[in-house]
Amino acid sequence: MQLFEQILSCYGWEGAALAGATLLMLGVQLYYYIFVYGRIPGYKNNRRPQTLDREPSVSVVVPLFSEDYSFVEERLPLILAQNYPDFEVVIVYVGHDSDFYEDLVRLKQSFPQITTTKIHLDPRFPISRKMALNVGIKSAHYECMVFTSTDAVPQTDRWLSLMAKGFMRGEIVVGYCGVERGKGFSNYMMRAWRMMHSADWIARAVQRRAYRGTLHNYGFTKSLYFGANGFSHLNMNIGEDDLFMQRVMTRDNVSVILSPRASLREKMWGGMGWWMSQLRYFGSAFRFYPRAVKTFVRWEIGSRVLFFATVVCALAVMPPEYKLAALLLAVIRYVVVAFEVRRIARRLGEGGIAGRYFIYDLLGPLWAAALGAMLLRRDNRVWR
């Protein structure tokens, strides 16, 4: 109380209000990075009760929407080389190239664990990823299924083993998928954005309040899928990894697999413009999230912006000692943020992010604002 009265006498109501707003936003930021994101590095899924007594057989389902020989020659072998005793790879080819499909079928001669099915592509009736996954689920021979994409690259031969172990403690398994590492500012921003936005749903999942996974690295059981009567929001081409998952996720049926050996990397097919287009496409589902989830996601960015604004205001108009105090609070916040980001990056197998994180820390809200403006316009690619 004496401190407040001293601030009030020295700097007036304006200075006291500014100090209060700065401290409040700092408190929100520290709460997020220490008590929310800070739980990610120390999380252990094996603390959850075990429901299966042995590692299950697993079907890996991969939708293939083009004649992608680079996937067949480069990324499919990494899936087939997984160090796991009993699994199959279900490839759902959506297209009309008979020669390419025959090449896929012939792969079974060398790799018996491959199961291939085809959906004929008719331009009059577009096939969504949900439809392809539905066919893959029905074609899978095993109860436990892991879903990935043709763009995702396993980093080790332990990926499938670790994901499969998750089914011993839950009907749903979620893992992390980062962005492939490259050179330049754009690649760094894309990698940092992916990691920190993944930290949102991972942090909620380790708190047993899961609301989504990533379409490149997640799984669930057949019983769960058919018990929910399949995917939801069938008028949308997206939502299989979030809107559907929100229907079936509970406090007790989600396993979170966090390990550099279980992480994937998504191959990038363009620069910043392509990436923003992807964020707009998949981000169109966000408006249908529960209000509590939207509030949780927005408060971190909002409190960061308000904290920066109060510090800038203090540096611009307040006396020297006030400026020094505001600058000290900014330094304290960044030290805490950088420390926690480094811990999270280490747990997820991300390198080269923490050292330059101040770039993303400052520019991330501007990027989020640009994406929010893009989402105000309807994306016709989303709707059927």
Where are these regions (language model features)?
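N-terminal membrane-anchoring/stem segments of glycan-assembly enzymes
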Residues: M1-L52, V341
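Cell-envelope/extracellular polymer assembly enzymes that use nucleotide-activated donors
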Residues: P56-S59, E88
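Acidic donor-binding segment of Leloir-type glycosyltransferases
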Residues: L76-P123
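Long helical/loop segments within the catalytic core of UDP-sugar-dependent glycosyltransferases
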Residues: T116, L121, F125-S128, A132, ...
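Short aromatic/hydrophobic "clamp" motif used to bind/position activated sugar donors
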Residues: M145
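Acidic donor-binding/catalytic loop of UDP-sugar-dependent glycosyltransferases
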Residues: T150-K165
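Catalytic donor/gating beta->alpha subdomain of glycosyltransferases that bind UDP-sugars
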Residues: I172-H197, S223-F226, F231-K294
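Membrane-embedded multi-pass helical conduit in multi-pass membrane proteins
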Residues: R304-N380
